[in-house]
C-alpha cells in the first residue's frame, strides 16, 4: 500500500466521540503557558542603519530602559556587528533580549560590500542552531538561541527616495530575516513630505522585489489591527528617553524651540504603532516566522548540500545510512579526483620548471660562450698591442744606441782637434 493510501485510510478512520466525564486535557494550554513562563523567552533584534541615526535611542525608548552602549565612530574601516544581551523581567515573564547593532554601516566610501557582514552574521546564527540540532546529545532547551527574529531597518529621512545601499541590503536580507522598515528621526521632515516619502518607499520596495515582514492577518484575534497597521508601513518614529512637562503630566518627548514632539502621541509619530506591532501583538509570530520560514530555508539548503533530500510519497525513502554511504562515496570520489588533479598539476609544474631551467641553462651557456669569445678577442687585441709596443721599444732602443754611439764618436773627434793644434803650435 502506498503512503498516500495509508494516509487516506487513516483520515477516514477518525471519529468524533463524546466523553461521559471530565478527563483533564483541557489544561494543556495552562501547562504550556506555565512551561513557557518557567523557561522564559528570547527575542533578538537586529538594528541596521547609519551611524547616528538613532538606533540606540529607539531601543531605549521601546523597552523603557537605558541599555549600556558604546559610542560608535564614523571612521570604521568596515561594518562590525556588535551584539548585546540583556535580561529583562516584566511581571512574572522573563525575557532575554539581544540587540545587535551594525557599527560603521554606510560610513565607508565604497559601500558595495556593506551588507555582506550583516548577511554573514545572520547565517552564522542559523549555522550555530543547526549544529546544535545535529548533535547526538543536543540540548535545545538550554541552548541560547541567537537567531535574528526581526530586523529594524532605519531609513534616513531624506524625503526623496531610498538609497541604493538600502535597496541592495534589504534585498539581500529579505529571505533571511523579518524586515520592518522604519523612518528614523521623522520629526525632521513635514507631515506632507513624510506621507509622500512613505508612498515612495513602498513603491520602490515593491518594484525592486523586496519582501518586508507583513503583520499576519490569518488570526481573527489580530487580523483587523494587523491589516490596518500593514497600511501604515514604513513606520515614522521618533525616539527619546527625556521627559518633558506637557500640561499637568510628564511625557517622553523631544523639546524644540518651536514646540514639543511627543513620542507616544500618534498624531506626532508612529512610535506607538511600532511598539504595538513589534512587542505587544506580533513578537511570537516574529519568533515563529524566523523558525518555520527563514531557518527552515537555511536548514533545507544545508541538508541538501550534505546529500539529504525529501522523497516523493510513492518512492522508497532513503535511510540515513544509505545517504551517509552515498555522500561518503561521493566525497571519496571527489577527493580522489582532487588528488589526481593536484598530482597532475605538480607533474606539469615540475616539467615547466625543468623546461625553464633548461632554457635558462642554454641562455647562460650562450652568454658564457659569447663572453668567452669577447674575452679571447680582447686578449688577442691586448697581445697584439703588447707585441707592437715591444717592437716599438726595441726600435727605440736601437735608435737610442745608435744615437749614443754617434754622439760618442762626435765627442771624441771634437776633443782630439785641440790636442793636434797644441802639438802643431809646439812644433
UniProtKB/Swiss-Prot annotation:
GO CC annotation terms, alphabetical: cell division site; microtubule cytoskeleton; septin complex; septin ring
Composition skew (Polar residues), residue ranges: 406-418
Sequence ranges of Basic and acidic residues compositional bias: 376-389
Positions contributing to GTP binding: 49-56, 104, 185-193, 239, 254
Record-level GO BP terms: cytoskeleton-dependent cytokinesis; protein localization
Region (Disordered): 376-427
Occurrences of domain Septin-type G (ranges): 39-305
Residues making up the signal peptide according to the UniProt record: none
CDD domains assigned to the protein according to its UniProt record, in alphabetical order: CDC_Septin
Keyword GTP-binding attached: yes
GO MF terms, alphabetically ordered: GTP binding; GTPase activity; molecular adaptor activity
Annotated keywords: Coiled coil, GTP-binding, Nucleotide-binding
Origin: domain of life: Eukaryota
Region (G4 motif): 184-187
Coiled-coil segments on the chain, per record: 320-409
Region described as G3 motif: 101-104
Region G1 motif, residue ranges: 49-56
PANTHER family assigned to the protein according to its UniProt record, in alphabetical order: SEPTIN (PTHR18884)
Similarity comment: Belongs to the TRAFAC class TrmE-Era-EngA-EngB-Septin-like GTPase superfamily. Septin GTPase family.
Name by which UniProt lists this protein: Septin-8-A
Source organism of this protein record: Xenopus laevis
Amino acid at each position: 500500500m502506498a503512503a498516500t493510501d495509508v494516509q487516506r485510510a487513516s483520515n477516514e478512520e477518525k471519529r468524533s466521540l463524546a466523553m461521559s466525564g471530565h478527563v483533564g486535557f483541557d489544561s494543556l494550554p495552562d501547562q504550556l503557558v506555565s512551561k513557557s513562563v518557567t523557561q522564559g523567552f528570547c527575542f533578538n533584534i537586529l538594528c541596521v542603519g547609519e551611524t547616528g541615526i538613532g538606533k540606540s535611542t529607539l531601543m531605549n525608548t521601546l523597552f523603557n530602559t537605558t541599555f549600556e552602549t558604546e559610542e560608535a565612530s564614523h571612521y570604521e574601516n568596515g561594518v562590525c556587528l556588535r551584539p548585546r544581551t540583556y535580561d529583562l523581567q516584566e511581571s512574572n515573564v522573563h525575557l532575554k533580549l539581544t540587540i545587535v547593532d551594525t557599527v560603521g554601516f554606510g560610513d565607508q566610501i565604497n559601500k558595495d560590500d556593506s551588507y555582506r557582514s550583516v548577511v554573514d552574521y545572520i547565517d552564522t546564527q542559523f549555522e550555530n542552531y543547526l549544529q546544535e540540532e545535529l548533535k547526538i546529545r543536543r540540548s535545545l532547551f538550554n541552548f541560547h538561541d541567537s537567531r535574528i527574529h526581526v530586523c529594524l531597518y532605519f531609513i534616513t529621512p531624506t524625503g526623496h527616495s531610498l538609497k541604493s545601499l538600502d535597496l541592495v541590503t534589504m534585498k539581500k536580507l529579505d529571505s533571511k530575516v523579518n524586515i520592518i522598515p522604519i523612518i528614523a528621526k521623522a520629526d525632521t521632515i513635514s507631515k506632507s513630505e513624510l506621507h509622500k516619502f512613505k508612498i515612495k518607499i513602498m513603491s520602490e520596495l515593491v518594484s525592486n522585489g523586496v519582501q518586508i515582514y507583513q503583520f499576519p492577518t490569518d488570526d481573527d484575534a489580530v487580523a483587523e489591527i494587523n491589516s490596518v497597521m500593514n497600511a501604515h508601513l514604513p513606520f515614522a518614529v521618533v525616539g527619546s528617553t527625556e521627559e518633558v512637562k506637557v500640561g499637568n503630566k510628564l511625557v517622553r518627548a523631544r523639546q524644540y524651540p518651536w514646540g514639543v514632539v511627543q513620542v507616544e502621541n500618534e498624531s506626532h509619530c508612529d512610535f506607538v504603532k511600532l511598539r504595538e506591532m513589534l512587542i505587544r501583538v506580533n513578537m511570537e509570530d516574529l519568533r515563529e516566522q524566523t523558525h518555520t520560514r527563514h531557518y527552515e530555508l537555511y536548514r533545507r539548503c544545508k541538508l541538501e548540500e550534505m546529500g539529504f533530500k525529501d522523497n516523493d510519497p510513492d518512492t522508497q525513502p532513503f535511510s540515513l545510512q544509505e545517504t551517509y554511504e552515498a555522500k561518503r562515496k561521493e566525497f571519496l570520489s571527489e577527493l580522489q579526483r582532487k588528488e589526481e588533479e593536484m598530482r597532475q598539476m605538480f607533474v606539469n609544474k615540475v616539467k615547466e620548471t625543468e623546461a625553464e631551467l633548461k632554457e635558462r641553462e642554454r641562455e647562460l651557456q650562450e652568454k658564457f660562450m659569447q663572453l668567452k669569445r669577447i674575452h679571447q678577442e680582447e686578449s688577442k687585441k691586448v697581445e697584439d698591442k703588447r707585441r707592437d709596443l715591444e717592437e716599438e721599444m726595441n726600435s727605440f732602443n736601437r735608435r737610442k744606441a745608435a744615437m749614443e754611439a754617434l754622439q760618442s764618436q762626435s765627442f771624441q773627434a771634437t776633443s782630439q782637434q785641440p790636442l793636434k793644434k797644441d802639438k802643431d803650435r809646439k812644433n
